[in-house]
Amino acid sequence: MKFLLFCCLFGTFLATGMCIDCEHCVVWGQNCTGWKETCGENEDTCVTYQTEVIRPPLSITFTAKTCGTSDTCHLDYVEANPHTELTLRAKRACCTGDECQTLPPPVLEPQVNRPNGLQCPGCIGLTSTECNEYLVSCQGSENQCLTIILKKPDFSLSEMSFKGCASENLCLLFEKKFWRFLEASEVDVKCTPAVPQTSQ
């Protein structure tokens, strides 16, 4: 259960100062309807995203809508790979006003696993800020090594750690500090360039 919670948090890309109202929801599957909520003063767009967690032969998809910032709208596809057999990826789309009623939801294209010759240390710690690292082969657009440490969590979360390959778009999103849903927690994020795989 905690692993699924981690994946949800990972995929919640909450994405300057007029106030707008955006629909908020998170559901398993591809159709998401919820309630309207006034966004923060620095949030000027609504964001819909579809996130997929893949661990062959299983795949879990969920869709969410929330507030965001328009300076992250171009970061519309992100992916990460903390384990050789586990992939996390998300597609995002922005909208405002009536456009949100007609904009088609973002759709993830079928996953094609293509190693790109890079590697990073990878691991997931569901209840700790530390985890046992091992080398992970990066795929597709993953050219960064991402480390996320969740400290001082609120009552609904435990400490967590995540290390693995990631796309540059995901690192740029974290630079924008999009995690409004973790305001009560301390989150340390670091990205470094992935390194070429060494021959065995």
From Swiss-Prot:
Pfam families: PLA2_inh, UPAR_LY6. Keywords: Disulfide bond, Glycoprotein, Phospholipase A2 inhibitor, Secreted, Signal. Its main location: secreted. N-glycosylated. InterPro entries: CNF-like_PLA2_Inhibitor, LY6_UPA_recep-like, PLipase_A2-inh_b-type, PLipase_A2_inh_N, Snake_toxin-like_sf. Disulfide bonds join C22-C46, C25-C32, C39-C67, C73-C94, C95-C100, C120-C145, C138-C165, C171-C191. One of its GO terms (molecular function) is phospholipase A2 inhibitor activity. This is Phospholipase A2 inhibitor gamma subunit B. It comes from Elaphe quadrivirgata.
